[in-house]
Design a protein with these regions (language model features):
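Acidic-enriched, low-complexity/disordered segments with a strong bias for Aspartate over Glutamate
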Residues: 3, 24-30, 78, 92, ...
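Secondary-structure boundary elements
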Residues: 1-14
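Cysteine-centered nucleophilic/redox motifs
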Residues: 11-38, 70
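His-Asp-centered catalytic microenvironments across diverse enzyme cores
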Residues: 39-145
Length: 145
């Protein structure tokens, strides 16, 4: 995650590394209308159908998930993959903040984990943070298959 140029060298990357690379490129070229965001959205069976069995098995309606994207002239641009459709999650965004490219390394994880801890405190969820984080990891693994 530290070397954003790996996106080009390896021809792959995450939502974090791809958008951080593009924002960094924009900054270095004095392109001011590009903003970089982390959005926390309700990852659920509707917007992420592949994880339904995991959510169902654990009796969870959704898990707050972090996703990175750009806004260019205020319009969301998501280049995570050719199938990325921000429209799938835009109505499920719980919170978003603008960040700098170097914040995707440590800050993104801390921000996401803090959000989850607060969500657990303020929801009827009976699972622990560790349980939720592990279920989330299982969902992410399922999505990479």
């Amino acid at each position: 995650r530290y070397d954003f140029s790996l996106v080009l060298k390896e021809n792959k990357g995450t939502c974090s590394s791809k958008h951080a690379y593009l924002k960094d490129f924009a900054d270095k070229n004095d392109i001011k209308n590009v903003k970089f965001f982390i959005g926390i959205f309700k990852m659920n069976e509707k917007n992420t159908p592949k994880i339904f069995p995991i959510l169902s098995q654990n009796k969870i309606e959704y898990i707050p998930e972090a996703h990175c994207y750009l806004k260019i002239n205020g319009k969301v641009v998501d280049v995570t993959s050719e199938n990325s459709l921000f429209e799938k999650i835009e109505n499920d965004i719980l919170e978003e903040i603008e960040i700098k490219p170097n914040q995707v390394v440590d800050f993104k994880v801390e921000y996401h984990q803090n959000f989850l801890r607060n969500w657990l405190k303020n929801s009827n969820q009976t699972k622990s943070f560790s349980e939720i984080w592990n279920i989330r990891e299982e969902c992410i693994q399922k999505l990479s298959e």
